[in-house]
Structures are given as structure tokens and as C-alpha cells.
Curated annotation (Swiss-Prot):
PANTHER family: DNA-DIRECTED RNA POLYMERASE I SUBUNIT 2 (PTHR20856). GO terms for molecular function: DNA binding; DNA-directed RNA polymerase activity; ribonucleoside binding. Its EC number is 2.7.7.6. Gene3D superfamilies: 2.40.50.100, 2.40.50.150, 3.90.1100.10, DNA-directed RNA polymerase, beta subunit, external 1 domain (2.30.150.10), DNA-directed RNA polymerase, subunit 2, domain 6 (2.40.270.10), RNA polymerase alpha subunit dimerisation domain (3.90.1800.10), RNA polymerase Rpb2, domain 2 (3.90.1110.10). DNA-dependent RNA polymerase catalyzes the transcription of DNA into RNA using the four ribonucleoside triphosphates as substrates. The RNAP catalytic core consists of 2 alpha, 1 beta, 1 beta' and 1 omega subunit. When a sigma factor is associated with the core the holoenzyme is formed, which can initiate transcription. The keyword Transferase applies. InterPro entries: DNA-dir_RNA_pol_bsu_ext_1_sf (IPR042107), DNA-dir_RNA_pol_bsu_external_1 (IPR019462), DNA-dir_RNA_pol_su2 (IPR015712), DNA-dir_RNAP_su2_dom (IPR007120), DNA-dir_RNAP_su2_hyb_sf (IPR037033), RNA_pol_bsu_bac (IPR010243), RNA_pol_bsu_CS (IPR007121), RNA_pol_bsu_protrusion (IPR007644). It comes from Clostridium acetobutylicum (strain ATCC 824 / DSM 792 / JCM 1419 / IAM 19013 / LMG 5710 / NBRC 13948 / NRRL B-527 / VKM B-1787 / 2291 / W). One of its GO terms (cellular component) is DNA-directed RNA polymerase complex. Keywords: DNA-directed RNA polymerase, Nucleotidyltransferase, Transcription, Transferase. It catalyses: RNA(n) + a ribonucleoside 5'-triphosphate = RNA(n+1) + diphosphate. This is DNA-directed RNA polymerase subunit beta.
Length: 1241
């Protein structure tokens, strides 16, 4: 069965039994298509909605008549935007017309409406120099939803919710007395008949006449205390506006504005589509029995006779003939079914109206009126165009309301069905385009208010469109969306797969969505409608589980925002599966029986078996072959891209597969990537669609190749396409982006051919890790609890070495005392520290730096200080004016080191755009080569993660009979309880494939079976069980048992020990408690908490305990004195009073308790009020500020840090690695001499 398959430049041996019928769509089209829709249609829709803006007298009219994005005037390219920290955007120019009705004067102008962020080819945005992704949001679709609860007597009480896109909700509920109530916009409930009366049915008789005789309706009428339309209107007004004097007119206008004003109530296209689907007569009466003859009102012919069953086809005919009310009999009851009076326009109009953009059902009364009054084709078209908002109303109409009430009444008799809110037919995706459109609409409506105000204020003669329009609110709302919306996220750029997954993510969180706290289990659960649309595996662990999902591989989002998945259609006449593919939404799928992708077919597409296993909505059935409706396109159609990259996924437990999918996204790009020997065949598609590989724009011949660029001569016109390659750029997460050409000179390339490899790709396939020779064997306890034992060879040969690039920036600002200056001339710095600094004061490229080294020399003017008498004397003698500056150079932070790979300088003089107050900005990029080391986290693709516990010399590793040592030893106990057996199969197949020199593709759910793996092992000349004798590298003796050995694909994850390890001696302290801050980012200390204190108490270590609670924590004076004593080599003094104790006393004083502190002999101990009092006599400052005394901290120096502690702002800008070596110890011993009074000290 194994056969070669060509993927890009590599041939893989595939175990797939299925021919791929459907082509996988472009994996980031969710982003690209949605943004394109916004530019083509979305913007126009908003302008149409807001047109025209009139002033309050109706005299001035402002209209937007067209717009264009000025693509020729884009200021910077994508690369330049990243360098300069600007937004990649194009100016939006809008054509505006202002009409003055009095004078008839028309003014037209093109108005600039701000820069509009553009999407890059990769589906991302560059905002302020950072690459961001707009995540698609899964929200409840507008529509009518029905549900029921069972009361204590076992009776079903039905309820309904009518949800618009924006506007007032309607909620129906039934109480145990069978009275149906309605809540309008979450107010108090009213009997539903009051709403019906207010809509036009005044008397009880009219209501019963319209809706038919029904028990619950009668019960509700009895409860209803209004009898006329006017009373009903007043009753509703009292509920909605309590406390205001009710009048019929105000009630009428209130209801009109609540429901029938398109600006206040918007169903959106989706809402209208869902309404028409739910409330249509046809679906509700299909397969029911007619209670009366059903007659076509136009022709008078009988469509269905009394007592006949109404078929699906007849039901559609009834609906489209304009019949809106049908009586059907259910168990001797006659129930009236009322629809919302929408028909298919195609059954009335035979000529082509595709250019009118009417794709929904249309409102019958309006259509009927047009067709009665006009006969000419052109006139009809003209009228349809004119009345398009009446034919397809954006707001709710009375017929919708009556239909929802009728549906509620019919549910008790089994007419219609209740809805499942977690069904993907009832949840839709809001992608970039729609989110942007909503945001833009907010900005425009704010602008509309401003325009109306300006129309009334300004002189109507001289007014121009430009003067009326204020673009600030529009620009602000767009900026706010991209900068701070929950759905605009900093792109996850660790490797190409994480980028791709981020763009395909579906989030139920965000504005208008759920919140983590309120989301229950049902929302997070896997639902049968997710099949082929959302991945059941890939979702985060933790509080967001199930709320953030990933789009399945073949899924698409349709124009309404519903997720569709492709199926092959089954020709029922012939009973064969065709190659025709249909994309189907979740609610359409519910009516079908669907066969698996790997169901056996003969060469003509007929089912081989008589009985076929199929998926019905939420169960698996076995049916005869002739009943199957559809068939899956591919075995991997139900999972996402990351999950489809796990070989033998079918043999892994789901929770481990989830970890595997998530951890692949954290794999760091390695120095030498290697495509997996055992892949799944999707690696190439994922790499190409992720957008990190340069692809040929046109067919041609490669003319020139270097490390930096590739040139291709086009076949079409002989011109040359040049492709610049990225070299050692920093990604959002600090990993390294680097491209290497993979084509040769004179090579022929087609359009779309991959020209170069990027980070984590190998020959155009995604390559996140390395193929490693490993064995499942315990070794001296070093792989206890998932630890890994690795060979020194992995370190020596740079197998798991990755490059990380960090960016540091220094800015020279204007201060109150004068401008800061970037210079080489820094006070108190020896020539040795400046050896790599050039004459401008900036480090040279290629220099090797360690923590504490200067990157950019910078001095800040100091305030004039009061001079002492000695200093004044010295000044008078030597006549030297002090240089009053202090060193504020940018230095390499603690624990960082590396090589300078790039320096960028931006200055005001060169015309670079800099933030206000900044004159010069310098950015340095430091690259580190990180070899694999103890403490690094690694994993396979099956959720088998571990931490490196020991690096063993190569000669000590267990070795094979042919002398090759293993590279990694894994614990065999990590497999059985975790049930991820896929890793074992991968190891066996990799063992065979490596020997045969194959690369293998084993697609998920359609991969290699056990007999095939055994066959491969035999072919490679290995034992069938994949085990081999291993020898101990230390003694050379064989181990007692044979061991499973093979090749496993192993990833190095982004949790590197170098980023986590951290130590502090002294550093910044919290302002209030005076305790050291916490965490590596703040250069904090280790927390010694309550339980640790108990441990010392239990041990009786009194002195250690006292020291930890005072001088090592918040005894301000004690810690300075202790430090002095250590420096001078004296004994450590007694601890003082910790700050926490003073805070406690202050709290007691706040409770009006007078607390005094007494010593042993009853003398009162005086507590100094503030830090300044205490530290007056100290001449060492261990917070690392320049001046020897601890300055009182000014409020503006304090900034909030993340954990809610206060951090001294000086810490951010100044160097906090206090180098105590610099302190001159002799001074402390000897007192001060005259030479100490020069300005540098």
C-alpha cells in the first residue's frame, strides 16, 4: 500500500489509503478574505447606513458618495514600519457632497479620513511597529431561539428569546398556569397578548381569529387586563418608562423607535436569514396533516387536500405561493401555523436580478404590490432596487413578531423544535472585516453627532464638508480597536505553526462574547456540530479551555459567518459517491447521514459494503448504502492544522494529543532544522500557507542566488523579480527569523514554488525539531518523573541550539534641566568599559557583551546642588566648573549576554518620527546562541514532555550493537498510564524509515497500521518487535532486557532555563512595605512566606529567622548598616525595627488604639516616622541611586508594577545591578580626604 508522494522538493512514502478529493483551502483565507470583503463592501455598507446626515431643520444634507484607499501613498513598507515603530496604513479618502436645500448649492470635496491600517500578505497588521493578529470571534447568532423547562408536575414550559444584532430583546416565557408572558428588553413581564394588541389586533376576537383557538392563548387573554390597542400601548409604556405620564402617542413612538427604526434595531443580514429559516411556514408544516384544503390564492387550485400529509416539496410550494397561515391537525387539535410572510423571489420573477444583490427571501406583501402595479421588466427592476430595504428589512417587522408567537404556541403540539445554543448553526464567526466594520460604525456615529452640531453653529453660506467633518472620533475608534481590543493580539511568532494557528483561532471571549467566569461546561464542551468545523483537540489548558478553539483544516467561513465543511455528495439514484464537493453549514448537516472518509468504495465510487456506518446528528448509525447522503472529504477534516501534524494521532489519548498540539506551537526554531522522518504529509501545506516562505510570484528561471536575495527571470516578459531574504531578524517572541535559499542558479520555477527556507522549515516543510535516536530505558534514576537524559553530543554538535535576539533601546529626551546627551564621555567610567564603544557613544556591531556592559553611553544633566565650604574653596583654587551630569547609560541587564548583531539610530535631524520630547533613539540587538542545557524543557509530538536532568558524556550513554550511542533516554513508565501509544509507533516506524532512507507520511486517521510497521521493520532488517540489545556505555555489558530503540521527533520548547534562573543580592524595594520586589522582571528576591517561617520556627533557628524577617527584608536602617558592616569586615549589628511592624502600629492607631513600644526595662522606644529621619546618618545607599543619602522618593518616581507592588521608577531607566565592587572600601575605612571633594565623587 505504501506509495511515494511528492511534497514540494521532497518525496515522502505515504501510507494513506485514500485519494484526497477536495483541495485544502488556503489556511489563512479566514483573515485575507474577510479584510478584502471589508475594503470592497463593508465600508460601503457603513456609509450607506449613515447617509444622509441632515441638520435639525433638514436644510443641510451631507452625503458620503465614495471612498478609496490611496494605495500609492503608503508612507513606509512593512519592513520599514517594523523598524520605525509606525503603523502600516494607507490614507482613506472619502468623497463628500454637501447640499444646501435653500440655495440649491452643492459642494463636493475629497476629505481625508485618517490612515487606515492595512493587512499584510500574511494576514497580520503592523501597529506601532509590532505585528498583531485580529482573532476571529465566535458569538451567538441573531435569531429566534426556543427552549423549555420541565416544572414540578412534569409539564413542559416553553420559552423563547428573540435576539437582534443590536436593539431590544424579546423574551417569551410560559408559567405553570399556561399564561405566556413577554419581557421587552429585560423589563418586567407582561401577558403576551398585550404586545399582540399593541401591534394592531385590538379585541380578543381578532386575536383568537388570527392565531386560532388555543388553550394557552385563551389563558393569556383571561390574564390580560387590557381590551383595546390603546390600553395595550399605555400598559407597555408604563412598563418601559415607569414614572413618566403615559400617552398613546408617546407609547406609539416609543414602540416604533424600539423595534422599527433601523438605526436602533438591527437584525443584520444573518439575523434576517436565521429568522426566515426558523419562522418559515414550510419547515414547520412539512410531514404534518392538513386540517383544511390548502388553496393557492392566485390560481384557486387546491395544493393539499384536507387530511393529506404535507410533503417537504408541497410545503415549499405553499410558502412560496404567499400562503402565510396553515391549519394542521395534531391529535384531534387544529393548530394554526403562522409564518413571517417571506417568499422566494425566484418563484415570482423569472428574469435575472443577480445584480440587485437580493439573495435572501423577500417580504411578500411588498413584492405583491410591486408586481401588481408594474409589468415592464425594467420598471420592476427599478422598483425592486428602490424598495430593497422593505423587501429585505434590516429590522424586525410585525409579521416576524406574530410568527414568533405562533411558533411558541405550536411547540406544545410538537410543531417546530427547540434550539441548542451551543450548536454551530446558532453560533457564528465575526472575522476581522466585521469587527472592523463595527468599530468603524461606532466612530462614524460619534462623528455624525459632531457634524450635526457644527451644521447648526456654523454659517451656512461659507460652510464646507471639510469644515463639518471631524475625523478624530473615527481615527480614535480604529486606533483603540487595534491597540487595546481583547481580540487584537500580539502575534504569537515563536515558529511558523504558532503564527498560522494564531490566525486561525476562534475565540468565544471578547466584547459581545462570553466571559471566562460566566462560561459553564456546556459552552466549553465538544459538540457534534464541531465535526469538520472546529478542532475537538486543540484548545488551551486552563481557564480558557473550550472557549478558544481552532478552525479545522478544511473549514471555511461563509458570507453569513457560519462555519462550513466540505462533503462529497452521494448520487442517490445510482447509489454512487461523486467527486462533487459541497460546503455545508452545521444546521443543514443535521438532516443528512454522512459516511466516513475511509468507507470502502470500488473504482467507480460505489460502496462495497451493503451496510454503512454513518454519522447522524449526535449518534452513529448503521444504515443501508442507499440511504447515505454525504461522505467525508478527508480523514483529517475534523482536526486543526497543528493536530493534523501529530502522526498516529488515532493511537493517542485526547488530553495528551491536546498537549502535543499546544506544545508544537512553543517549539523554538533551531539552528539546523530537520523535517520529521515520520510526518503526516501536511507539513508542506502548513509551511507554505503560514506566509513565512518567499514564493515565486511568476514562473521563470533562477538567475542569481545569494544568501541575501534570489532573482528570477520571468518567462512571460523577460523581466526580473527580486526576492530579498530576511537575515537574523527578531520575532515578536525574541526567536530568530532567518531565510536560506533552496533553489539553484538556472533552476526552473513555477508560480508559487518555494524559493527559500525560513525559520523552522526544511525544504519547504515545517521542521520544528530534530529526529533523535532514542531508547525507552531508565538510567540511574535520571529519568524519574519525565526527566530526560541526553548525550553530550547534542550540545557539542549544536543539535538543539537556537538563536535568540533581544532588543534594547535608549532614548535621549529633553529634561527640565536641559537635553540628555548620547556620548562616549561618561563620568566615572574607565577606558576599559568603553573599549567597544565608538566615538558617538554607541556599541559597535559584532562586540561581545556581558551583563553590566554599556550599550549606549548617555548622560543626564543633574540639578545644581548646594556646594560645601571645602568644595567652594577647591573651585576657587582650581577654577574648574563642575560638569553637572550623571551617568544614565543603557547597560546590558542582569543575566543577559551575547553578540551585538544590529544597531539602529533614529534622530530628529534625520527627519525620523520620534515620540514627543525624544531627540534621539538608539536600538541595539543582542543575539545569544543557546545550547541545550540542564533544566530546558523538551517534548515529542504526543504530549510527552520532560525536563533535561543530566547531560551525559557520549561514551557513557547506552549504545547499540553497531556502536552508535543513544542521544536521549526516555522513561518507559511515561507511556502506559498516559496512553499516548502513538509515540511508540512513531519510534518503530522512524527506526525502520531511517535505515531505509525514507521520509514517511502517515496522515491522521488514515496512517500506517501495525502490520505495515512490522513489514517496514522487516524490510529494514530489524526485529519485528522493534527492540534491540543495548550495552551500558560505562561497563560495556549488555542490559538484561532488549530495549525499544528508534527515532523520535523531539522539539525544544520556549521554556528555557536561561530565561527563568535568577538571583539577587540587593536591589529595588517596594515603596509601602519596603520589602524587596518579587519576580525576575523586577529583579526581585525570593519570597519567604508564612509556611517557610513555620519551618524555621519548628527548627528553632531563631537568629536566621530574625535576620530573614528584618535585615534581609524590610528593616531599612538595619539592611544598610549590615551592608556597611560586611564591606568594612566588622561584626553584623543588631537588627532594628522592620517597616512591617511600623505599618502594624499605624493600623492599630487607625483603630484609635494608642500603642507604645517598650524595651525590656520599660523605656519607650521611639519609632522614627519616615525613612528620611532614619537614614540621615547613613552614607551608603543600597538601592543603587547615585547620591549617597537615600533621597525621599517623590510620588512621580513611583510606578505601578504588574503584581500591584510599587516599583521605583528610577529602576526602569537606571542601572540597578548595583556593582558593589565600584564602592571604594578604603574611603569607608579611612574617612574622607581632600581629593574626595571633586565633582566626580
Amino acid at each position: 500500500m505504501i506509495h511515494p508522494v511528492q511534497v514540494g522538493k521532497r518525496t515522502r512514502m505515504s501510507f494513506s489509503k485514500l485519494d484526497e478529493i477536495g483541495v485544502m483551502p488556503n489556511l489563512i483565507e479566514v483573515q485575507l478574505d474577510s479584510y478584502q470583503w471589508f475594503l470592497d463592501n463593508g465600508l460601503q455598507e457603513i456609509f450607506d447606513d449613515i447617509n444622509p446626515i441632515q441638520d435639525y431643520t433638514g436644510n443641510l444634507i451631507l452625503e458620503f458618495i465614495g471612498y478609496k484607499l490611496d494605495m500609492d501613498n503608503i508612507k513606509y513598507s512593512v519592513e520599514e514600519c517594523k523598524e520605525r515603530d509606525t503603523t502600516y496604513a494607507a490614507p482613506l479618502k472619502v468623497k463628500v457632497r454637501l447640499l444646501n436645500k435653500e440655495t440649491g448649492e452643492v459642494k463636493e470635496q475629497e476629505v481625508f479620513m485618517g490612515d487606515f491600517p492595512l493587512m499584510t500578505e500574511q494576514g497580520t497588521f503592523i501597529i506601532n511597529g509590532a505585528e498583531r493578529v485580529i482573532v476571529s470571534q465566535l458569538v451567538r447568532s441573531p435569531g429566534a431561539y426556543y427552549d423549555y423547562i420541565v416544572d414540578k408536575n412534569g409539564k413542559k414550559l416553553f420559552s423563547a428569546t428573540v435576539i437582534p444584532n443590536r436593539g431590544a430583546w424579546l423574551e417569551y416565557e410560559t408559567d405553570s398556569n399556561s399564561v405566556i408572558h413577554v419581557r421587552i428588553d429585560k423589563t418586567r413581564k407582561l401577558p403576551i397578548t398585550i404586545l399582540v394588541r399593541a401591534m394592531g389586533f385590538g379585541s380578543d376576537a381578532e386575536i383568537v381569529n388570527y392565531f386560532g383557538e388555543e388553550e394557552r392563548l385563551k389563558a393569556t387573554i383571561e390574564k390580560d387586563n387590557t381590551k383595546t390597542r390603546e390600553e395595550a400601548l399605555l400598559e407597555i409604556y408604563k412598563r418601559l418608562r415607569p414614572g413618566e405620564p403615559p400617552t398613546v402617542d408617546s407609547a406609539f413612538s416609543l414602540i416604533n423607535s424600539l423595534f422599527f427604526d433601523p438605526k436602533r434595531y438591527d437584525l443584520s443580514r444573518v439575523g434576517r436569514y436565521k429568522f426566515n429559516k426558523k419562522l418559515a411556514v414550510s419547515i414547520r408544516i412539512a410531514n404534518k396533516t392538513a386540517a383544511k384544503d390548502i388553496v393557492n390564492p392566485e390560481t384557486g387550485e387546491i395544493i393539499v387536500e384536507k387530511g393529506q400529509r404535507i410533503s417537504k416539496e408541497k410545503a415549499l410550494e405553499i410558502q412560496n405561493s404567499g400562503i402565510n397561515s396553515v391549519d394542521i391537525s395534531v391529535d384531534d387539535n387544529i393548530i394554526r401555523v403562522i409564518g413571517n410572510n417571506f417568499v422566494d423571489i425566484k418563484s415570482y420573477i423569472k428574469f435575472d436580478i443577480s445584480d440587485l444583490n437580493i439573495r435572501e427571501l423577500v417580504y411578500y406583501p411588498v413584492l405583491k404590490e410591486i408586481l401588481e402595479n408594474y409589468t415592464d421588466e425594467e420598471a420592476i427592476k427599478e422598483q425592486l432596487k428602490k424598495n430593497v430595504h422593505k423587501l429585505v428589512p434590516k429590522h424586525i417587522i410585525k409579521d416576524d413578531m406574530f410568527a414568533t408567537v405562533s411558533y411558541e404556541l405550536g411547540l406544545a403540539y410538537g410543531i417546530g423544535n427547540v434550539d441548542d445554543i451551543d450548536h454551530l448553526g446558532n453560533r457564528r464567526v465575526r472575522s476581522v472585516g466585521e469587527l472592523l466594520q463595527n468599530q468603524f460604525r461606532i466612530g462614524l456615529s460619534r462623528m455624525e453627532r459632531v457634524v450635526k452640531e457644527r451644521m447648526t453653529i456654523q454659517d451656512q453660506e461659507v460652510i464646507t464638508p471639510q469644515a463639518l467633518i471631524n475625523i478624530r472620533p473615527v481615527a480614535a475608534s480604529i486606533k483603540e480597536f487595534f491597540g487595546s481590543s481583547q481580540l487584537s493580539q500580539f502575534m504569537d511568532q515563536i515558529n511558523p505553526l504558532s503564527e498560522l494557528t494564531h490566525k486561525r483561532r476562534l475565540s468565544a471571549l471578547g466584547p459581545g462574547g462570553l466571559s471566562r467566569e460566566r462560561a459553564g461546561f456546556e459552552v466549553r464542551d465538544v459538540h457534534h456540530s464541531h465535526y469538520g468545523r472546529m478542532c475537538p483537540i486543540e484548545t488551551p489548558e486552563g481557564p480558557n479551555i473550550g472557549l478558544i478553539n481552532s478552525l479545522a483544516t478544511y473549514a471555511k467561513v461563509n458570507e453569513y459567518g457560519f462555519v462550513e465543511t466540505p462533503y462529497r455528495t452521494v448520487d442517490k439514484e445510482q447509489g454512487r459517491v461523486t467527486d462533487e464537493i459541497h460546503y455545508i453549514t452545521a444546521d443543514e448537516e443535521d438532516r443528512c447521514l454522512i459516511a466516513r472518509a475511509n468507507e470502502a468504495l470500488d473504482e467507480n465510487g460505489y460502496f462495497i459494503d451493503k451496510k454503512i456506518t454513518v454519522r447522524a446528528p449526535d449518534e452513529v448509525l448503521v444504515v443501508p448504502a442507499n440511504e447515505v447522503d454525504l461522505m467525508d472529504v478527508s480523514a483529517r477534516q475534523m482536526v486543526s492544522v497543528a493536530t493534523a501534524m501529530i502522526p498516529f494521532l488515532e493511537n493517542d489519548d485526547a488530553s495528551r494529543a491536546l498537549m502535543g498540539s499546544n506544545m508544537q506551537r512553543q517549539a523554538v526554531p533551531l539552528l539546523k532544522p530537520q523535517a520529521p522522518v515520520v510526518g503526516t504529509g501536511i507539513e508542506h501545506k502548513a509551511a507554505v500557507d503560514s506566509g513565512i516562505l518567499p514564493k515565486a510570484r511568476n514562473a521563470g528561471v533562477v538567475e542569481y542566488v545569494s544568501a541575501n536575495e534570489v532573482r528570477v527571470r520571468r518567462d512571460s516578459d523577460g523581466g526580473v523579480d527580486t526576492y530579498r531574504l530576511l537575515k537574523f531578524k527578531r520575532s515578536n517572541q525574541g526567536t530568530c527569523i532567518n531565510q536560506r535559499p533552496i533553489v539553484e542558479k538556472n533552476e526552473k520555477v513555477e508560480k508559487g514554488t518555494v524559493l527559500a527556507d525560513g525559520q523552522s522549515t526544511d525544504l519547504g516543510e515545517i521542521a520544528l525539531g530534530r529526529n533523535i535516536r532514542m531508547g525507552f530505558i531508565t538510567w540511574e534514576g535520571y529519568n524519574y518523573e519525565d526527566a530526560m537524559l541526553i548525550s553530550e553530543q547534542l550540545v557539542r554538535d549544536d543539535v538543539f541550539t537556537s538563536i535568540h535576539i533581544e532588543e534594547y533601546e535608549a532614548e535621549a529626551r529633553d529634561t527640565k534641566l536641559g537635553p540628555e546627551e548620547i556620548t562616549r564621555d561618561i563620568p566615572n567610567v574607565g577606558e576599559d568599559a568603553l573599549k567597544d564603544i565608538d566615538e558617538r557613544g554607541i556599541i559597535r556591531i559584532g562586540a561581545e557583551v556581558r551583563s553590566g556592559d554599556i550599550l549606549v553611553g548617555k548622560v543626564t544633566p543633574k540639578g545644581e546642588t548646594e556646594l560645601t565650604a571645602e568644595e567652594r574653596l577647591l573651585r576657587a583654587i582650581f577654577g574648574e566648573k563642575a560638569r553637572e551630569v550623571r551617568d544614565t547609560s543603557l547597560r546590558v541587564p542582569h543575566g543577559e549576554a551575547g553578540i551585538i548583531v544590529d544597531v539602529k539610530i533614529f534622530t530628529r535631524e534625520n527627519g525620523d518620527e520620534l515620540p514627543p520630547g525624544v531627540n534621539e533613539l538608539v536600538r541595539c540587538y543582542i543575539a545569544q546562541k543557546r545550547k541545550i542545557s540542564v533544566g530546558d524543557k523538551m517534548s515529542g509530538r504526543h504530549g510527552n514532555k520532560g525536563v533535561i536532568s543530566r547531560v551525559l558524556p557520549e561514551e557513557d550513554m547506552p549504545f547499540l550493537p553497531d556502536g552508535r550511542p543513544l542521544q536521549i533516554c526516555l522513561n518507559p513508565l511515561g507511556v502506559p498510564s498516559r496512553m499516548n501509544i502513538g509515540q511508540v509507533l512513531e519510534v518503530h516506524l522512524g527506526w525502520a524509515a531511517a535505515n531505509l532512507g525514507w521520509h514517511i507520511a502517515t496522515p491522521v486517521f488514515d496512517g500506517a497500521l501495525e502490520p505495515e510497521i512490522v513489514e517496514c521493520l522487516k524490510r529494514a532488517g530489524y526485529a519485528e518487535d522493534g527492540k534491540t540489545v543495548l550495552y551500558d556505555g560505562r561497563t560495556g555489558e549488555a542490559f538484561d532486557n532488549r530495549v525499544t530503540v528508534g527515532y523520535m521527533y523531539i522539539l525544544k520548547l520556549a521554556h528555557l532555563v536561561d530565561d527563568k534562573i535568577h538571583a539577587r543580592s540587593t536591589g529595588p524595594y517596594s515603596l509601602v512595605t519596603q520589602q524587596p520586589l518579587g519576580g525576575k522582571a523586577q529583579f526581585g528576591g525570593q519570597r519567604f512566606g508564612e509556611m517557610e517561617v513555620w519551618a524555621l520556627e519548628a527548627y528553632g533557628a531563631a537568629h536566621t529567622l530574625q535576620e530573614i524577617l528584618t535585615v534581609k527584608s524590610d528593616d531599612v536602617v538595619g539592611r544598610v548598616k549590615t551592608y556597611e558592616a560586611i564591606v568594612k569586615g566588622e561584626n553584623i549589628p543588631e537588627p532594628g525595627i522592620p517597616e512591617a511592624f511600623k505599618v502594624l502600629i499605624k493600623e492599630l492607631q487607625a483603630l484609635c488604639l494608642d500603642v507604645k513600644v517598650l524595651s525590656d526595662n520599660n523605656n519607650e522606644i521611639e519609632l522614627k516616622e519616615s525613612i528620611e529621619d532614619e537614614t540621615e546618618d547613613l552614607d551608603v545607599n543600597i538601592e543603587g541611586n547615585e547620591d549617597s543619602k537615600v533621597e525621599p522618593i517623590r510620588p512621580q518616581d513611583v510606578q505601578e508594577n504588574v503584581s500591584g507592588e510599587n516599583v521605583d521608577a528610577g529602576y526602569e531607566n537606571e542601572d540597578v545591578d548595583i556593582d558593589y565592587e565600584d564602592l571604594d572600601i578604603d574611603d569607608l575605612k579611612n574617612g574622607l580626604g581632600l581629593e574626595d571633594f571633586n565633582d566626580e565623587h
